[in-house]
Amino acid sequence: MEVSEGSVTVEVPEERHGASEGSGEGVFYNPVQELNRDITAAVLRTVSDDCDEYLDAMAASGIRSVRAAAAGYDVTACDIDDDAVALTRRNLDRNGVDGTVHHRNVNAHMHESAHDVVDLDPFGTPMAFADAAVRSAGEYLCVTATDTAPLCGAHFESGVRSYDAVPRNTEFHAEMGLRVLLSALVRTAARHDIAAEPVLSHVTSHYVRTYLRVDSGARAADALLEHLGYIDHCQRCLWRDHERGRVPDPTTTCPHCGQSTWTAGPVWLGPAHDAAFVDDVAGAIPDSFGTADKARDLLSTVATELHQPTHYDQHKLYKRWNEPNIAMDDFLAALRAAGHEASRTHYGGTTFKTDADVADIRNAVE
């Protein structure tokens, strides 16, 4: 079958929804990831003045490679699947664009070759490729993770094993997954004296996607490590707190309701995006992209999110309070009127961030 994205048309063997249907056998095309690919294409447009070379680390159908090549990038693609290599070459040819396609283990390739932009889009965890990727990426590292259950703590042991962190399955589980992933990537880069700083991140349709600007130097890496720390969370009243540091000093009892608390970490507590960069990416999305409106809406919300490391769900708070909820706009206005910062988030229509704690939130909206 044929599919079109952006300005390219490619041959794909079958559609499969990735995380929801499993990796399956052989090469497949995931239509749910079109938003991911559209935003990636916009990122490549945004950074094109500084970047020329793009590595598609898991080529599959080659659609990422073809779109990058059509944008003027010097493209290299890797895959260990014979069919994927052949299909990627055909799709480059049919679109009249150039690219080098390697049939080899991408870790071996990344250890030997540098690229301005490295794009990791595996099925499952990206951590098996992270060490090689941070060394190969000269300017930007783009990473997808589809193993959201381990990342958010729903599959606890797998999350600990894959990300060397304690994830917790909280009501802000999507952001928990993002911050566990960012922590693992930042720590991996720092081991190689590389600073990997997130400039755009989102959690959409059972996957986490982040873009990190990379720079070499132990001091820069050390500075980013200062943004690692731990989150304490109460499952009963939804109180939470966070503390930066390498060694956890957990609050074991909730100061608000007395319930025993959970501690997660080390997680990334710093900004997950750079608002100016996100705005530039949104401005680089043309109307011809299939998910243009959705991508712009998503990025608009991401750009205005506060940098607090956790978000709340308004409906879940009101459920705990056993009260009917009010309109979100009125809710956020009440928080701001009480002197607090507040913003919507991209994690859901009733999610928000604020610098207020649970008690202050309730006082502000009563």
Curated annotation (Swiss-Prot):
GO biological process: tRNA N2-guanine methylation
UniProt keyword Cell inner membrane, yes or no: no
Record carries keyword Cell cycle: no
Alphabetized PROSITE patterns for the sequence: SAM_MT_TRM1
Enzyme class per UniProt: transferase
Gene Ontology MF terms in the entry: tRNA (guanine(26)-N2)-dimethyltransferase activity; tRNA binding
Gene3D superfamilies (UniProt xref): N2,N2-dimethylguanosine tRNA methyltransferase, C-terminal domain, Vaccinia Virus protein VP39
Signal sequence bounds: none
Catalytic activity reported: guanosine(26) in tRNA + 2 S-adenosyl-L-methionine = N(2)-dimethylguanosine(26) in tRNA + 2 S-adenosyl-L-homocysteine + 2 H(+)
Keyword list, A-Z: Metal-binding, Methyltransferase, RNA-binding, S-adenosyl-L-methionine, Transferase, tRNA processing, tRNA-binding, Zinc
Domain called Trm1 methyltransferase: residue spans: 1-365
Chain intervals for the UniProt region annotation (Disordered): 1-28
Entry EC no(s): 2.1.1.216
InterPro entries, per database record: SAM-dependent_MTases_sf, Trm1, TRM1_arc_bac, tRNA_met_Trm1_C
Residues where S-adenosyl-L-methionine binds: 37, 64, 79
One Pfam family in the UniProt entry: TRM
Positions annotated to bind Zn(2+): 234, 237, 254, 257
Entry-linked NCBIfam families: PRK04338.1-1, TRM1
PANTHER family assigned: N 2 ,N 2 -DIMETHYLGUANOSINE TRNA METHYLTRANSFERASE (PTHR10631), TRNA (GUANINE(26)-N(2))-DIMETHYLTRANSFERASE (PTHR10631:SF3)
Family: Belongs to the class I-like SAM-binding methyltransferase superfamily. Trm1 family.
Role summary: Dimethylates a single guanine residue at position 26 of a number of tRNAs using S-adenosyl-L-methionine as donor of the methyl groups.
Protein's recorded name: tRNA (guanine(26)-N(2))-dimethyltransferase
Gene it is expressed from: trm1
